[in-house]
């Protein structure tokens, strides 16, 4: 997802730019990019399947979650580590790197079934069945 281009495909050409979805940018009569894109990003993702794997940041996934229906299966991947209290702590930079590596893993391995992403292991992150739910796949850093 891109605040500037919308939904991107793997080989789409893009010009380098710096624009965040949450930018307070008026476009036409819309007060921000969330309003500008409306449900069009969701509709584009939903064309092929009702299963949506969310590897986006909260900033970007917000523009999809708002439009989800009961028929949709929306699964978010969380990359973190357990702190002393047993709670999952997400380090933004590591999580961003892991999300990118997950995309590469899916493309390299031609992943078509959602459960196959559970086999992902990289940057010491490994799927945790104990902390995962049907809506959130948790990958914990192995220390």
Task: Show the residue positions of the predicted features.
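Internal, well-folded beta-alpha domain core
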Residues: 2-133, 138-143
